[in-house]
């Protein structure tokens, strides 16, 4: 399983391994000509094609989360210099698992954006005073709301880029089943908007027409029908 969430993840390129690698003959020279590489040492793609978002690594929270959930036996730790390009899952991964990954918001982990969003509950009917999760807690906050909450209680919301986000336009899970006829063997599980809150609609590769609603883009305008 491989994942690339807006970060260059390719490492060293072995042109002799034609099964796993394919690269332009002038890749390194282009990097030199554009001031991306000095030509010294190993050519490591993700280090040469620098991505400021990656913060000096070839992964961030999303890559770590997927690898950690699918291959926990590897013992990968956030903060390591680099991660492998892909991992072998500890068990088979079906479409349901992939859909679950796309719904993930790091709930219960150190990156859970709701972990500090608590309220004080006073003592009542013999139950001692305690803290509990705010009924308003959710990982779908807008930037103005996050800023407002942090101005009231500094540090209450520590923003993390989760796998599922409220500003997603659409997401797909593509399933291929070679043992079925071509018309139904391939299916696109399609969801609009937030992957964690939207149902998935199966669109078979043999489909030649979809309902009229699919012909309208609802990203900029609301259509009641």
Predicted features and spans:
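C-terminus-biased signal that marks the final domain/tail of proteins
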Residues: 2-225
């Amino acid at each position: 399983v491989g994942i690339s969430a807006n970060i260059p993840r390719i490492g060293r390129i072995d042109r002799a391994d034609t099964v796993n690698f394919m690269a332009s003959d002038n890749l390194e020279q282009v990097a030199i000509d554009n001031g991306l590489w000095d030509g010294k040492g190993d050519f490591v793609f993700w280090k040469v094609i620098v991505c400021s978002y990656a913060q000096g690594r070839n992964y961030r929270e999303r890559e770590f989360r997927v690898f950690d959930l699918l291959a926990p036996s590897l013992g990968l730790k956030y903060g390591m210099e680099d991660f492998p390009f892909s991992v072998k899952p500890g068990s088979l991964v079906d479409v349901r698992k992939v859909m679950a990954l796309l719904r993930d918001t790091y709930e219960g982990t150190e990156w859970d954006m709701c972990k500090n969003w608590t309220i004080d509950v006073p003592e009542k009917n013999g139950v001692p005073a305690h803290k509990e999760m705010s009924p308003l807690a959710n990982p779908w906050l807008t930037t103005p709301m996050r800023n407002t909450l942090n101005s009231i209680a500094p540090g209450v919301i520590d923003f993390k880029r989760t796998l599922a986000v409220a500003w997603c336009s659409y997401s797909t899970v593509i399933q291929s089943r070679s043992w079925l006829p071509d018309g139904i063997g391939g299916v696109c599980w399609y969801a609009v908007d937030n992957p964690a809150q939207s149902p998935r609609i199966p669109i078979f590769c043999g489909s030649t027409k979809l309902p009229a609603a699919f012909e309208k883009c609802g990203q900029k305008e609301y259509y009641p029908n």
